[in-house]
Amino acid sequence: MVCTTLYTVCVILCILLMYIILFRKMIHFLIDLSLIAFVISSCIRLSNAQFFANDMLYNGNVEGVINTTNIFNVESLCIYFPNSAVGRPGPGKSDGLINDNNYAQTLAVLFETKGFPKGSVNFNTYTKISDFINSIEMTCSYNIVIIPETLANSETIEQVAEWVLNVWKCDNMNVDIYTYEQIGKDNFWAAFGEDCDVAVCPLDTTMNGIGCTPASTETYEVLSNDTQLALIDVVDNVKHRIQLNQVTCKLRNCVKGEARLNTAIVRISNLSSFDNSLSPLNNGQKTRSFKINAKKWWKIFYTIIDYINTFIQSMTPRHRAIYPEGWMLRYA
């Protein structure tokens, strides 16, 4: 009986050994197959999720009210305007500034009459034009940027509008070491800072200057002077030496991407050449770029509130907001 039991045990052990030797690869195959099936099933469960395209890096907090029943909607409106528009509190002042410490609450209540829920409108001030490259992020469903226009800054405003109304991909530039060239019509160099004086020297295929001497910056052609923001456009596919004061100005190599459809710009102008076709009172031109002919900031905000639907209808809201590495967007 004992011998029979031992024989049986030996036979079982031999069978197991043969199974392990002959069918080990099959076991590994089955394990791998199970893992693949698990991954595929996980992907299928996520197939109804939304996918997003890169926009630009986000370094701040989201401003807005998140819809808890649909986390892919960010129902909010951000309005950016210069902090110089806010004056000192006092009744009956005629300086045209917002002389009220509670202006945000007052405007928010007026926006409620147009259908914006309480807490969904955010008022943000900026100090200088270059803030729009350096720090400001368009993180709301809808964004309206208000910029005063004068004869002195009309060129800058054109370039700010180009920057704000589009999505950009940028890299830092080291002009001390490298030469740079632009490779297409959507490739620009963005200069921003306190004082941007940018001059260039185009080079031929032998690295000699075209109309300039690379070693002598005095012979360079000036493209920007005394500006806070400039989009530098040079001849494509030609290498350039670049000269600028890197203490007061930074330069980035940028490529324009898709339109930022959730953002509109409002230019405040009282110039004699005011283009009335861009006024929201005439429904604008649906280009997300408007003009308001006014000097008083309360009048400006009242006009924006009263015609907010005209602004909103020219835009497409941003759906979805944040993940740790930066913010991404997708339009409806």
Swiss-Prot record:
Disulfide linkage: none
Signal peptide (from-to): 1-49
PTM annotation: N-glycosylated.
Keyword set, alphabetical order: Calcium, Capsid protein, Disulfide bond, Glycoprotein, Host endoplasmic reticulum, Host-virus interaction, Metal-binding, Outer capsid protein, Signal, T=13 icosahedral capsid protein, Virion
Main location: virion
Cellular location(s): Virion; Host endoplasmic reticulum lumen
Single GO MF annotation: metal ion binding
Pfam families: VP7
GO cellular component labels: host cell endoplasmic reticulum lumen; T=13 icosahedral viral capsid; viral outer capsid
Gene3D superfamilies registered for this protein in UniProt: Glycoprotein VP7, domain 1, Rotavirus outer-layer protein VP7, domain 2
Record's subunit section: Homotrimer; disulfide-linked. 2 Ca(2+) ions bound at each subunit interface in the trimer hold the trimer together. Interacts with the intermediate capsid protein VP6. Interacts with the outer capsid protein VP5*.
Family named by the database record: Belongs to the rotavirus VP7 family.
Function statement: Calcium-binding protein that interacts with rotavirus cell receptors once the initial attachment by VP4 has been achieved. Rotavirus attachment and entry into the host cell probably involves multiple sequential contacts between the outer capsid proteins VP4 and VP7, and the cell receptors. Following entry into the host cell, low intracellular or intravesicular Ca(2+) concentration probably causes the calcium-stabilized VP7 trimers to dissociate from the virion. This step is probably necessary for the membrane-disrupting entry step and the release of VP4, which is locked onto the virion by VP7.
Protein name, as recorded: Outer capsid glycoprotein VP7
